[in-house]
Amino acid sequence: MDLLFAHGDDGSPILDHAPDPGTAAAQASPVPRQPQEGFLADITAEASNLARQRWAVVTPAGAEGARLEALIQPLVRARAEDQQADVLSIRVPPGMDAAAATAWKKDVFPALYGEQEAERPRYLLILGDLDQVSLDTQQVLAQDGFPGRLAFATDDGYGAYADKVLAWQREPARQDRARALFYTVHDGTRATTAGHARLIQPCHALCARTTRDKAREFPASAVEVHGRPTPDPDELLALAAARHPSVLLSMSHGLGPPRRRPWSPAEAREHQGAMSFGVEGALAAKDVGSVPFLPGGLWIYFACFGAGTPRTSAYKHWLDMLALHGMADLGPASATLRGLDQGGGFVSGLAKAALANPNGPLAVLGHIDLAWSYSYEELRVGNARGLTGSNRSRNFYNLITKLVAGERAGAALLALRLVLGDVSAELNDHYDRYKRGGTVEGATPADALALGNLWMLHQDLRGYALLGDPAVRLPLASPAPARSAPADSSGERGQVTLCGGDHPADRDAGALDRLEQAALAIAGGESPGVIAQKLGVPRSEVAEAAKIYRDAGRAALSALLGRGAQEKGRAP
């Protein structure tokens, strides 16, 4: 198990060696814990279909919530058009813990959408920092929804982000395939070395192989892995400057406080979770706030506190339990988690700056807590009370595949959410099995170690949070479908002439194909707003194309019926 967290002064890792489970204390007594109640998600419709899944805004209760929502009104109006329905404004009490958020979701939320499942919004844009709408609230909503969060240091950030999303949505897309980029900071530490070998390399290899052999399953224009042997922030900045829709998966330590003193609250909000480049410094908020950095792209940022810092860590009590049962090397990590932020938590300065940048990414996925290796390398207690690992890099391959294919960011996260559901079920089975035997955590230290590591996996997966509008997707043009030669070119088939404009042959064939596919999709029941967003054109254009296509088709069918009647009349 590896931790991606480094000191802010010298870039050295806080934990740079693997704990040895073989030294587990034989006499340690497990402390009973209560299992969490889980929720079942009912996923019945196409997850990226905004008209069916609905989109809503979640803000803190009171005047502050209304003020925050007013800052993104252009985006709210656009989403209302996309889903062909009014946007629901959801106000929640600030500071709710998990129990309060669960009770609110069960007792209050259904009345807001009329208690009709077809009207329940799943795409939920949360406005405000963690002290305004709590992290617990976001995680409870994520049990069967697709939440994303926007939080900025100034009001201007909200407007700038909304303008950026709408600009990419309305600008005609120039590329129909995305880049899949992988980047590792090779700082020589154990965690990044292992992360490169066990996540970046396997995931890159699988993406590259699928692109080569089954391009339709992973439609990327490039699958590239980067990271110089000597870390250099400028290398990443140059790589991310290209104005080409891209998904970036990066592996690095997240920046923590210096060894000799704690950060002030203001310093923590600006620097904690910045991308550590070891002795070469860090990629911080000031570095990504004004230069092109993954414009129109999506960033999976794998680092401690990369997305933010919670009020209290979800790991501390489990780290203490593992240390009690022999994994004493985890002590330094646990010590860093005492009173992370008494103010309620905060979104990282790096993510805020990147999202507020007009030439920055549309969304950032990262940890609001420590980032461990559990999500890509699951650890289990073996027969000899040693830890065995299984590579889970395919979790991230599945996520990147959905993003590259143009799925909405919130829907793509189902790839990780479903894994979390499996772990939750396993935890419930664990508690039920041992409760039958008269214990809760198990009778032996090995049982406690197994439970502790399973909970670490659960918390690691649960710690991922999406920053940005969950409805964003890579701005890609729909690829032109392959066209086959007509089965009958004898000239006997009816002809349809459209008035106005020059000869169809003078038109761009790809654009014509895209409009045809849009018209067919709308005829099949798809929302014009959804299709327009996918193509990057105004809704009015696809609606007009659908009408013209329908009218022309009906005219051709009418001519066909008329000709059939004439031929029938001439028959002997």
List the predicted regions and their residue ranges.
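Catalytic-core segments of thiol-dependent peptidases
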Residues: 79-80, 110-132, 207-348, 359, ...
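Short Lys/Arg-enriched helix C-cap and helix-to-coil transition segments
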Residues: 550-570
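Major-groove recognition helix of helix-turn-helix-like DNA-binding domains
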Residues: 538-552
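Pre-catalytic or accessory/regulatory segments outside the catalytic core
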Residues: 1-140, 436-437, 443, 450-477, ...
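Active-site-proximal C-terminal subdomain of hydrolase catalytic domains
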Residues: 182-190, 205-209, 213, 305-492
